C-alpha cells in the first residue's frame, strides 16, 4: 500500500567475467532507505543486495492503464498517450542498476517482482502491485433474479494493511430492498479476509 515500507532483494550473477561492478542503484516508484556502495561481482557466484524501500504516498494503485479513466461507449480513454500499445502497465516499482564492465558503463531496468511458493504449483513469480488497504468483491459477478424471490449475495472484504475497519453496504436501484442495510468489519491482521451475507429482494415489478 502507499506509504508502506518493504524489504527487497536484488540478485545478480556474472557468468563469465569478474570485471563487473555494481556502481549505483536507483529506485523508481519508491524511496530507497538503505545505502548502496560499489560492489564487484564474482564470477559464477550469486550476489544478493538487500534493499529497504518505502512506497511513495503519491504512487497510484496498480491497474491496467486503459482502465484508469472511465471509458466511453466502445472506446477506452488513455491520458498518457505513450502507454498506448503496451501489453500491460509499467511496473509499479522498478530498479535501474548501473554497472561498470571494464571501462564500459551501462544500466538496465528490473521490475520488482513478488516471489512465493505453493505446494501444488511450486515457485511462482508475479509483478509487485500497489494496492489499497481494503479490497471488496462480490462472490459472484452476476446474480439473476428470475422472479420476486429473495436471494443471498455474498461480499468478500480483504485487508492488505493491519487495523482496517469500516462499514459495507449494497447500492441497489429504487424499490429494491436489502437486509441488513449495513454491516461492520474490523480486520486487525494484514491479509485477513471475511465474507458478509446480504439478502436482496427485488420489487414486485421488473426493473433494471
What are the language-model segments listed below?
Residues 13-58, 160, 164-190, 203:
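Proline-anchored loop/turn motifs at beta-strand termini and strand-loop-strand connectors
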Residues 9, 32-40, 78-83, 136-142, ...:
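Short structured motifs
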Residues 5, 88-94, 150, 191-193, ...:
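Extracellular Ig-like/FN3 beta-sandwich strand-entry sites
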Residues 41, 52-89, 102, 186-190, ...:
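Short, surface-exposed loop/turn segments at beta-strand-coil junctions that are enriched for proline
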Residues 1-4, 127-151:
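Beta-sheet-dominated interaction scaffolds and their linkers
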Amino acid at each position: 500500500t502507499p506509504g508502506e515500507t518493504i524489504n527487497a532483494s536484488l540478485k545478480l550473477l556474472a557468468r563469465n567475467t569478474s570485471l563487473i561492478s555494481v556502481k549505483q542503484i536507483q529506485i523508481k516508484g519508491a524511496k530507497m532507505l538503505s545505502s548502496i556502495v560499489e560492489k564487484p561481482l564474482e564470477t559464477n557466484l550469486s550476489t544478493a543486495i538487500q534493499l529497504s524501500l518505502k512506497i511513495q504516498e503519491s504512487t497510484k494503485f496498480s491497474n491496467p492503464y486503459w482502465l484508469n479513466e472511465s471509458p466511453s461507449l466502445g472506446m477506452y480513454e488513455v491520458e498518457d498517450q505513450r502507454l498506448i500499445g503496451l501489453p500491460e502497465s509499467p511496473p509499479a516499482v522498478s530498479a535501474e542498476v548501473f554497472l561498470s564492465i571494464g571501462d564500459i558503463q551501462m544500466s538496465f531496468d528490473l521490475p520488482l517482482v513478488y516471489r512465493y511458493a505453493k505446494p501444488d504449483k511450486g515457485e511462482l513469480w508475479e509483478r509487485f502491485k500497489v494496492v489499497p488497504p481494503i479490497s471488496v468483491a462480490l462472490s459472484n459477478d452476476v446474480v439473476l433474479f428470475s422472479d420476486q424471490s429473495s436471494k443471498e449475495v455474498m461480499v468478500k472484504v480483504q485487508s492488505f494493511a493491519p487495523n482496517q475497519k469500516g462499514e459495507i453496504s449494497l447500492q441497489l436501484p429504487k424499490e429494491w430492498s436489502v437486509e441488513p442495510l449495513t454491516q461492520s468489519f474490523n480486520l486487525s491482521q494484514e491479509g485477513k479476509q471475511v465474507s458478509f451475507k446480504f439478502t436482496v429482494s427485488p420489487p414486485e415489478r421488473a426493473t433494471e
